[in-house]
Amino acid sequence: MIVTLTANPAIDRNVTVDRLVFEDRAYILSTRKAAGGRGINASCVIRAFGADTLAIAPCGGKSGKLLEEFLSSCGFAFELVRVRNEIRTNMTVADRNGLAIKLNEKGPELTATEVGRLEKTVRQHLKSASWPLLCGSLPPGVPADFYARLIHAASKQGVKTLLDADGEEFDAALDERPTVVTPNQQEAERLLNRVLLTRNHFQEAAERIRGMGAGSVVLSLGARGAMAALEDGSILEAVPPRVEALCPIGAGDALAAAYAWSLRRNPDPVDALRWGVAAGTASARLPGVSFASLDQTREVYQRVTTRRIA
């Protein structure tokens, strides 16, 4: 079973408008709410691909009750850790041309006791996890080494980990050598404090992040695909077909989920990278924040090209 942790879940309000233009009005075409957060999104993809998954997240307030209602209809197992404060609400606004903006709240302040309960819950499921996916931002009150502690605990039990995080918590977790990390371009730029513009930049970034402690690095590059620096020292590139992207937000979550799903079936990182890029690309073709089915992803997978750079 693939276990996902969403340390800072949300109710996602996804709004589609006719067009997004700076300092001009836009008309709402549709709106919907859903359970959100990187780990929850990953569990949605894994479930759509026919695999078992358990989603773990804190949950509090009226928004937390709504989160539980949404998760109950998702078709996968979940375990919620009760917290006092209201979980956050995030908003995504996208137009029909693929332009999108995401507005995120910081999330609820967690007490030390609540943080301890959340950590204990994840630790209890490590032994049964084929892959724990540690995903997203940490809410206020959660120490920056939270993911690092979980990766350390998993490593002691011989459990492989995938980290999809940003900022200080990403940096701190690298010291514990996560098996795979999946930063996007902006997250890699923040970590390395440099702008990445060219293929050489992407390759150098992936290699540098691997050198900081990650076993393998999958650098998500949106419409350009992904660059991977693997544990054996090889560098891979995966390029998707050209598609009309309606909403790229959430594509990175789909990539991380499909990468872990593929490795669980077949320990071939080349094939996993191909599936990951296919899942991200197929999901970006859908309106709003949506995730492609296995059949939709397979159609794109057949057109993703991979090659070894080094």
What are these regions (language model features)?
Residues 1-56, 64-66, 244, 310:
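Glycine-rich phosphate/adenosyl-contacting loop at the front of the ribokinase-like
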Residues 44, 89-93, 225-229:
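Short beta-strand scaffold segments in enzyme catalytic cores
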Residues 47, 155, 264:
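Gly/Ala-rich phosphate-binding loop of Rossmann-like dinucleotide-binding domains
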Residues 171, 199-310:
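Conserved phosphate-binding/catalytic region of the ribokinase-like
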